[in-house]
């Protein structure tokens, strides 16, 4: 393989892993994948197979934490992806285009692949991983008190196979999540305390005002000089700070937004994108159109929280007070 092909393959693998981590954040390495697979469930009462609504790109991958191996189908039909962690108790059977897998007789399921060779290849890999788990003393110790292996059972083969679509169905784009900034502030703040804050807990500017001797009012010029000395550089907007924070990135990383698998051109099915979802363009800070109105108690609680924790907020309010006081003194 030429260097250019190796580089392209590495870039594609990295892109696929990044998309896979949007479903399972602990995914660390893709062991194999197929462009299409479908899930069948057995109806124990009727003793027949039923095709589920789950089909799409199939991945076998390694995880950074227990369970160490899993396989999944990035469902193209609805947002619910199929994820099956592998354990040493898994029983696997290969029959033509199907792979039967179960941990007990009540949970028998089947994977269907377009090609028998693909089914054989995936079966060999899954069986190898199960054997590796069985050979691990750590996994054996964890499963020592678990139920013994499920007994061998004859599994009825599905009577029909899913028709392979000629073209992957077009799915409507999902709307990005809406951000309620006021709700974010409200949920982040601590419950208001009934007792008044001590002077030591107040912002520096309020401490100075509270410690002034009665009757010795500060002049407007003195207040303005102290304000300039204590002023801090203006920070970015709260919304921008949250968007760039590690909390926003980690939340987006665990998104269950599905991948859309496709038979044929796999590369075109997995779109390259950022982990962080963009903000809705219709959300305008301060517009009042997308945010609920706070009642009196909520507004007082929010203002009290900001007065106690945000020195810059107090400074801005005080600046407005100084400006108003200067205007009043000039008029009078």
Curated annotation (Swiss-Prot):
Alphabetically sorted, this entry's keywords are: Cytoplasm, mRNA processing, Nonsense-mediated mRNA decay, RNA-binding
Keyword Repeat annotated? no
Q: Where is the composition biased (Low complexity)?
A: 141-173
| Subcellular localization | Cytoplasm; Cytoplasmic granule
| Tissue expression summary | Expressed in neurons including touch receptor neurons and motor neurons.
Q: Which CDD domains match?
A: Dcp1
- Which SUPFAM superfamilies does UniProt cross-reference here? PH domain-like
Q: Cite a single GO MF annotation.
A: mRNA binding
Q: What happens when the gene is disrupted?
A: Double RNAi-mediated knockdown with dcap-2 reduces survival at 20 degrees Celsius.
| Location (main, coarse) | cytoplasm
Q: Where is this region: Disordered?
A: 141-175
By sequence similarity, the record places it as follows: Belongs to the DCP1 family.
- Subunit comment: May be a component of the decapping complex composed of dcap-1 and dcap-2.
Sum up the protein's function in the record's words: Component of the decapping complex necessary for the degradation of mRNAs, both in normal mRNA turnover and in nonsense-mediated mRNA decay. In contrast to orthologs, does not possess decapping activity and does not remove the 7-methyl guanine cap structure from mRNA molecules. In the nervous system, negatively regulates the expression of insulin-like peptide ins-7, which in turn promotes longevity. This may in part be through promoting the activity of daf-16 in distal tissues. Required for the developmental axon guidance and regrowth of PLM touch receptor neurons.
Q: What is this protein called?
A: mRNA-decapping enzyme 1
